Every structure is written in C-alpha cells, then in structure tokens.
Amino acid sequence: MASERLPNRPACLLVASGAAEGVSAQSFLHCFTMASTAFNLQVATPGGKAMEFVDVTESNARWVQDFRLKAYASPAKLESIDGARYHALLIPSCPGALTDLASSGSLARILQHFHSESKPICAVGHGVAALCCATNEDRSWVFDSYSLTGPSVCELVRAPGFARLPLVVEDFVKDSGACFSASEPDAVHVVLDRHLVTGQNASSTVPAVQNLLFLCGSRK
C-alpha cells in the first residue's frame, strides 16, 4: 500500500503488524498523516496481511473507516521489500509486533541495512519490539550501543496478558547491553540517539514522528 505519490519526495517505509493483536489506530493515524506530508509512503506487513486496528475511538473511527476505502489500503508484503529503496523507516505502536515483527527475518534484513547506512528509523510504543529482530550472526543486537525507550514494565503489567507476553522490550534492551529509559506510565517520552528515534507509548507518537521528520530534513 502506497500513499499518493509525489515526485521528488523521499520514500518512507511504514511497517505494521499483521497479527490479530493489531495496530494502534491513533498511533497509525498520526504516523501516516504526519509522514505523508514529507514522504512517499509505503505500508508493509508480514505476508501483506490486512491490519487490525485496535483502540478505535469516536475521534478516529471515521478516519479508520475512510482509510480502509482508499485505493492504497492493501499493505505490501514485507518479505518483498528492498530496504535500499527507502530513506526512512517508521513503525507505529502495534501490540501485534510482539507476535510477528519481533521475530521477522525480513524486517531484520531491512533494519540491518538501515543501521549500516545510518538511515533514520522511528519506532513507537509496542512497535519498538520490532527492533528486537535485528540480531547479528553472533546473536548480538545491532542496536546494543544505543539509548532508547519503549513500553515500560510498569505500563505492561497493567494488561491482563502480561504473563503470556513473548517478549518484554525493557528486559530485552537491557539484556542486550543497550540503555533503556522510561518515564511514568502513559507519559510522553521520546529518545533520539543518532539516527534512531523511539517513543515510549502511543501517546508519544507525534513528537517521535516530528523527530523523524527533523532527522530527515537535516540530511538534505
């Protein structure tokens, strides 16, 4: 799925989950609308699966409904994406990321390319779990020297399924040797380290994407 294409705009890959646990409607809305002002956007999911939007509210339900009717509402297959064609990578808050993106070999390949080329990456909330797939052959994490944020344990334990989570981002980051920081639950908190922007939760989406746009603008 690609947004309306305009010439001379850099390309941004927006990676979302295709798992049943879904994609945060509000986070995706902000990611898509803000990034569309600066990029030609391509949305991709594992297997090209349709996105299941969660946390749909009265304020965003109409946008989600209209979005589904767009000609570009079918995601591309993540497996067929060539990361070299994109200038930026954006991952909204996706509870489903823990199920599919966090173990995606295709996304790992793209992230390794972005890391080696120091291309801008932005991951928000549960979408930060997607970064965990990017391990080297020696099982070290490509972001092990970075500072980042993501859902804190304090935020995650409030959900009934905490004990069944396949991955806890805060633990993974710390165990991998990277520096993890978090503010109080639900607070807006964004970390920028080199070319990597991370947001603690869906509430942090707007300032996180603003930082991505700043990073891309400073490279022109």
Curated annotation (Swiss-Prot):
Keyword Glycoprotein: yes
Keywords: Endosome, Glycoprotein, Secreted, Signal
Residue positions the entry lists as glycosylated: 201
GO biological-process terms attached to the record: methylglyoxal catabolic process to D-lactate via S-lactoyl-glutathione
Gene Ontology MF terms: glyoxalase III activity
Signal peptide: 1-38
InterPro entries xref list: Class_I_gatase-like (IPR029062), Prot/Nucl_acid_deglycase (IPR050325)
Domain of life: Eukaryota
Cellular localization per UniProt: Secreted; Early endosome
UniProt keyword annotation of Ribosomal protein present: no
A GO cellular component annotation in the UniProt record: early endosome
Main location: secreted
Family: Belongs to the peptidase C56 family.
Function: Component of the FERRY complex (Five-subunit Endosomal Rab5 and RNA/ribosome intermediary). The FERRY complex directly interacts with mRNAs and RAB5A, and functions as a RAB5A effector involved in the localization and the distribution of specific mRNAs most likely by mediating their endosomal transport. The complex recruits mRNAs and ribosomes to early endosomes through direct mRNA-interaction.
Summary of subunit composition and partner proteins: Homotetramer. Component of the FERRY complex composed of five subunits, TBCK, PPP1R21, FERRY3, CRYZL1 and GATD1 with a ratio of 1:2:1:2:4, respectively.
Name listed for the protein in its UniProt record: Glutamine amidotransferase-like class 1 domain-containing protein 1
